[in-house]
Swiss-Prot record:
InterPro entries documented for this protein: Cecropin (IPR000875), Cecropin_insect (IPR020400)
Name recorded for this polypeptide: Cecropin-B
UniProt induction comment: Induced as part of the humoral response to a bacterial invasion. Transcripts appear within one hour after injection of bacteria into the hemocoel, reach a maximum after 2-6 hours and have almost disappeared after 24 hours. Similar response is seen when flies ingest bacteria present in their food.
Species the sequence originates in: Drosophila melanogaster (Fruit fly)
Signal sequence segment: 1-23
Phylogenetic lineage: Eukaryota, Metazoa, Ecdysozoa, Arthropoda, Hexapoda
Tissue: Strongly expressed in larval, pupal and adult fat body and hemocytes after injection of bacteria. Maximal expression is seen in pupae.
Amino acid sequence: MNFNKIFVFVALILAISLGNSEAGWLRKLGKKIERIGQHTRDASIQVLGIAQQAANVAATARG
């Protein structure tokens, strides 16, 4: 009977400690994905600006 109580206590401690470490790991992964999204957004904004300038130059060259 005492073994069951000890086992439950140890399992509870392990679950709490693993739960905290998993949250940290998921947070790091989420931040990496967020950073990739920010870089993609910034790159697309730059490309749109360059394409708009090229369209303006082409329109000016046509007259």
